């Protein structure tokens, strides 16, 4: 396995670990989620370019589109929660409080 693939897998693992450790604030969770999506995009692009699979060249672009949609929805939710409660704690998103 090339060293760049190992580095990208380690970046994904670090973002996943950050997602598990810093889950109290919504902004840090969104940043870790974006890091995970970026490392998945780079790894899938490298794998597809190394294997010369012509049928799956669209997969990284579709992953990037879904990542952009996820980021837009996450930022809209962050703005809504911070305007409503004044904080970006994830505990504010509990639906059982209603």
Curated annotation (Swiss-Prot):
Its EC number is 7.1.1.2. It is a multi-pass membrane protein. Belongs to the complex I subunit 4L family. The chain crosses the membrane at residues 2-22, 28-48, 61-81. It holds the Pfam family Oxidored_q2. It catalyses: a ubiquinone + NADH + 5 H(+)(in) = a ubiquinol + NAD(+) + 4 H(+)(out). Core subunit of respiratory chain NADH dehydrogenase (Complex I) which is composed of 45 different subunits. GO terms for cellular component: mitochondrial inner membrane; respiratory chain complex I. It comes from Allocebus trichotis (Hairy-eared dwarf lemur). Keywords: Electron transport, Membrane, Mitochondrion, Mitochondrion inner membrane, NAD, Respiratory chain, Translocase, Transmembrane, Transmembrane helix, Transport, Ubiquinone. InterPro entries: NADH_UbQ_OxRdtase_chain4L/K, NUOK/Mnh_C1-like. This is NADH-ubiquinone oxidoreductase chain 4L. It is an enzyme of class 7 (translocase). Core subunit of the mitochondrial membrane respiratory chain NADH dehydrogenase (Complex I) which catalyzes electron transfer from NADH through the respiratory chain, using ubiquinone as an electron acceptor. Part of the enzyme membrane arm which is embedded in the lipid bilayer and involved in proton translocation. GO terms for molecular function: NADH dehydrogenase (ubiquinone) activity. It is found in: Mitochondrion inner membrane. One of its GO terms (biological process) is ATP synthesis coupled electron transport.
